[in-house]
């Protein structure tokens, strides 16, 4: 039996008002509405498609055997004005709508209906720069705006998601009891903490999604090495992934991959083998890669994961290339059990690289955009409810507890030891892919980053000499102080170069 004693706001002679208004009744919106209600809050809902809100409330009342829909504590409304009028002050309007122009459309409609101090929350996958703009715009009108990343899919929306709010901090004290109540919990801690000002919440969600792209591609590369390279059956794949999910690789994505390998189609054959090998994407991984380029951060693994999806989408072209550029058939003849372990090492090490690159990107963004991110709290928020929840997120939290100014997770003791332990197997797995002509773009790029990051000397001295040769871009010398720049007349036909002129 549900109870609603604490959060329903009423006064004598007044009708009962709602704690929160929710716009958007697609899959995520519906499940969030039920989650909010299940935690003792009354929620008013609105959907622009006529009849959807009424049908949702009526269906839920029927499913839950509630005779009077008023007792459902989910109130269907038929206009934005009715939605707003149903809310107590300060009003909280939570939008779960498609990112982009739709968000601005609803903001435009809500502004004249709201009063100073009211709050609009965008729970979609909005680009953080759009959230920056919306925070500033609404602040000028005396309204508060929160951009909140929500991860966890349909199940998380209903039973507890990872929630990453940022924007106008003045609004946090009002929405905190609701959002922390409905978020996932790990060890009694809510997977929802204030992230930072302006678009910080949506920025962190963007990086989360980039890491998600990386994790998924890494698993796919392990799958191809195991199935195509080692010839494992689906029953054997199931056993391998089930074992991995009981150890250091334990994570949501490994868990669901195990389930996928176990699932059979109507004819008893593995369903996954009947799915066309073309991957879709909604753009958040691409946003992460673009932002990394803008900040000058080597987000190599996530970039390769995005490109792998792009390549998969070129199915017809790949079919033509497969006929024109046939691979040499090579069979694996080594110790299969040892190679399975090596692939597991590669998956783990590359996964650590993905998180290290993601957190390094957030560190740079925090400085550039003045987000003041708390990386330990971010790791805590990702432990439950979300798609990238993994066992070692606790280790990330501990790393930042020890050193809040940690430059890169790879420098923490846990990561140092983990990488040293996995390195030999990681290299064997990449070599296997090379020998068998099986592409491993994320395994390989992660290894290249790892080797590059720990290289005291890289060949960029030659690169800078080339730049100076053809473009007079100057260079620094190792026998001179940093910050002093030189140009060489490499051909004897050049001219003078300064910081502001080029006459060579």
Regions found by a protein language model. Give the residues of each.
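C-terminal amphipathic alpha-helical interaction region
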Residues: 428-429, 434-504
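Generic secondary-structure signature for well-ordered alpha-helical cores
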Residues: 34, 38-41, 61, 85, ...
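Hydrophobic beta-strand scaffold residues
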Residues: 43, 76, 145-146, 299, ...
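NAD(P)+-binding Rossmann beta1-loop-alpha1 motif at the extreme N-terminus of oxidoreductases
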Residues: 9-91, 113, 117, 153-158
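Glycine/threonine-rich flexible loop motifs
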Residues: 92-109
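Interdomain hinge/lid region at the active-site interface
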Residues: 202, 227, 232, 239, ...
């Amino acid at each position: 039996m549900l109870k609603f004693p604490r959060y329903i706001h009423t006064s004598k002679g007044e009708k009962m008002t709602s704690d929160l208004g929710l716009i958007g009744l697609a899959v995520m919106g519906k499940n969030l509405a039920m989650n909010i209600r299940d935690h003792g809050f009354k929620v008013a809902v609105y959907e622009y498609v006529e009849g959807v809100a009424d049908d949702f409330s009526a269906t839920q009342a029927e499913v839950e055997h509630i005779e009077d829909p008023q007792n459902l504590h989910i109130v269907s409304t038929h206009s934005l004005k009715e939605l707003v009028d149903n809310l107590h002050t300060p009003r909280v309007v939570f939008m779960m709508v498609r990112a982009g122009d739709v968000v601005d459309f609803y903001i435009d409609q809500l502004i004249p209906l709201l009063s100073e101090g009211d709050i609009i929350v965008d729970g979609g996958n909005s680009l953080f720069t759009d959230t920056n703009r919306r925070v500033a715009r609404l602040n000028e009108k005396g309204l508060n705006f929160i951009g909140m990343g929500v991860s966890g899919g349909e199940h998380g929306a209903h039973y507890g998601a990872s929630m990453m709010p940022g924007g106008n901090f003045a609004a946090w004290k009002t929405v905190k009891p609701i959002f922390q109540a409905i978020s996932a919990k790990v060890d009694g801690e809510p997977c929802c903490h204030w992230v930072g000002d302006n678009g910080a919440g949506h920025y962190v969600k963007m990086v989360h999604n980039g890491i998600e792209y990386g994790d998924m591609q890494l698993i796919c590369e392990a799958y191809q090495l195991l199935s195509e390279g080692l010839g494992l059956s689906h029953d054997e794949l199931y056993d391998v992934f089930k074992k991995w999910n009981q150890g250091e690789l334990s994570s949501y994505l490994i868990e669901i991959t195990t389930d996928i390998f176990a699932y059979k189609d109507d004819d008893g054959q593995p369903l996954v083998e009947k799915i066309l090998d073309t991957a879709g994407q909604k753009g958040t991984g691409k946003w992460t890669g673009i932002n990394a380029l803008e900040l000058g951060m080597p987000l190599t693994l996530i970039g390769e994961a995005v490109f792998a999806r792009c390549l998969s989408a070129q199915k017809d072209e790949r079919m033509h290339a497969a006929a024109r550029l046939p691979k040499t058939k090579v069979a694996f003849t080594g110790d299969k059990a040892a190679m399975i372990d090596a692939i597991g090492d590669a998956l783990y090490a590359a996964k650590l690289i993905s998180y290290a690159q993601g957190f390094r990107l957030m560190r740079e963004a925090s400085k550039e955009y003045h987000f003041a991110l708390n990386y330990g709290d971010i790791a805590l928020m990702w432990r439950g409810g979300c798609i990238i929840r993994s066992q070692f997120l606790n280790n990330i939290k501990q790393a930042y507890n020890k050193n809040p100014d940690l430059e890169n997770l790879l420098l923490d003791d846990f990561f140092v030891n983990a990488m040293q332990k996995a390195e030999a197997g990681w290299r064997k797995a990449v070599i296997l892919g090379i020998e068998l002509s099986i592409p491993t773009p994320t395994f390989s790029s992660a290894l290249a980053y790892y080797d590059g990051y720990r290289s005291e000397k890289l060949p960029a001295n030659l690169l800078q000499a080339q730049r100076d040769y053809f473009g007079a871009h100057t260079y620094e010398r190792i026998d001179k102080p940093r910050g002093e720049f030189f140009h060489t007349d490499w051909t004897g036909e050049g001219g003078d170069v300064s910081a502001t002129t080029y006459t060579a």
